[in-house]
Amino acid sequence: MTSADRRRDAVARIIRARRIGTQEELLAALERAGFRATQATLSRDLARLGARRVSGPEGAVYELGADGADGGLAALRGLVSSIAANASMVVIRTHPGSAPAIARAIDLAQPPEVLGTIAGDDTIFVAPAGELRPRRLAARLAELLGTPSALAGDGGERTH
């Protein structure tokens, strides 16, 4: 195992063990664990580990990307406020600051029903692939994100 691999393992252990909100906090924890790194090196390590900052009720913290096929969607459950669909797209409302992480997780999961996502701070536009009806896609996303589905037919109802 190289020194870079050992450092990345330490970064992963620290993120799993503690609530780390900034790279400065993480650099300090790494130094206490006996590792030296620059902010640029740490930033590359975080990207390689699939770490991301996720906003939650207690502020933004780093989380590691999921190893599963869902692209990390399971870790983001509870951050979705609602899912709605119209005739052409799906709109997901999230807690403030959570939309980019959720959109990335959807993209990484690569559900065949999704052509692509566009995320703002708390809103995600999801374009359905092919001829798939957006309301059916909304129901599938509600299932993936662990959000109860209230969609029925083509009425455009919301899920909460």
Curated annotation (Swiss-Prot):
GO terms for cellular component: cytoplasm. GO terms for biological process: L-arginine biosynthetic process; protein complex oligomerization; regulation of arginine biosynthetic process. Gene3D superfamilies: 3.30.1360.40, Winged helix-like DNA-binding domain superfamily/Winged helix DNA-binding domain. It holds the Pfam family Arg_repressor. Pathway: Amino-acid biosynthesis; L-arginine biosynthesis [regulation]. Keywords: Amino-acid biosynthesis, Arginine biosynthesis, Cytoplasm, DNA-binding, Repressor, Transcription, Transcription regulation. Belongs to the ArgR family. Regulates arginine biosynthesis genes. This is Arginine repressor.
